[in-house]
Amino acid sequence: MDAYTARALSVLEGLAISGDPRSHRDPTTEATMSIFAMRFNSTTSRPVMGRPQRGKRGVITSTPQRCGIRDLEHHVAFVMPGYIQNPQTLAILARDEIPYTPSTFRRVQRYVSARMIIQMCERNDMLTPHYEAVTSPGVVLPAPAGGGPRCYAISATTLQIHIDPMQNEVLTPLIFPDQEDVIMAEFIWQRLANGIDNNAVMNMGTNVELLRDNAAVEGGTPFMATPRGIHVVLASYEPVNLCTIHLTCTRYWVTGPPRVVYDSMEADILAVYTYRDGFWDALRSYVLQALGMPAHHYPTRPVTEFRQNLAIAILSRLFDVYSQWRLRSTLQLRPKVLWWLAHRLQAALRAFRLGR
């Protein structure tokens, strides 16, 4: 079935460039479109042509809709209400004589393997979820009752660490929570010049440094560290004064599914979630909601299901075909371009605000 889906994507891509009568298609695309048009035209009263003439826009836009929706129906039991599908579309796309491009087949392979792929993913949210409360920055707090380092969270990503005079503190177990999926993180440390102790402002010690594998790290310079293998130590050389630093985690990496499965996925997502007009907004919203995806924004978590990734790929190519022929039809209405653009902007804002 991978070849069947690759043929459907190849046909949609070929139909997208058919809007330009001067386009020069590669041999594979030319053969795909020729054979598909020949087989498809024998099963319908609305034939599709390789170079559609003026007035045939309804044919060229309904053909990719049939291919895309039929592919979704085959893979995910998707049903489009009020739409009568050509039952021969599936049989035509399943014929071995219709070629497909290597790029489309490679993308289909990525859709299938998405749920089994694990890679190093960058994140910048809260690294220290075990800190349930935060304290005010600069306030000197006593050591914990049970002993241990004087380390407190002042934000979701920043820790405030006190160190007594002439002491060393190993920071690796403090800055990396006990999470198996954390691979490495990037930090920035800064020395606190003064703080508040007993309702009075006091100067903090200045002779303090942070060591990464026994090498000094300059304050304000980003450095990388790992939970295992790299030792991060805070050393105080002050004879009397207390030293305090702020350690901020700017980003970290964990193992998880990738957000981008194939090469053109980011461009496809942008095309799918672009407001074109009311018809496209309704079609896109219905298909995505039927597959359990948001209608007006891409999911915040990575998409690993084959059917959802396939829907993104198919809808993006339907958007290319639809935009190509809608653009050619609206270019004839030049005196009304400004009114048409203002109307589209108002409709887009209304659709996104209402969350249709």
UniProtKB/Swiss-Prot annotation:
InterPro entries noted in UniProt: Orbi_VP7_capsid, Orbi_VP7_capsid_C, Orbi_VP7_capsid_N, Virus_capsid_a-hlx_vir
Keyword entries, A-Z: Capsid protein, Glycoprotein, Outer capsid protein, Virion
Location in the cell: Virion
One GO MF term: structural molecule activity
Keyword match Cell membrane: no
The keyword NADP belongs to this UniProt entry's keyword annotation: no
Cellular-component GO terms for this entry: viral outer capsid
Sugar-bearing residue positions: N41
Matching Pfam families: Orbi_VP7
Top-level taxon in the UniProt lineage: Viruses
Function: The VP7 protein is one of the five proteins (with VP1, VP3, VP4, and VP6) which form the inner capsid of the virus.
Family to which this protein belongs: Belongs to the orbivirus VP7 family.
UniProt protein name: Core protein VP7
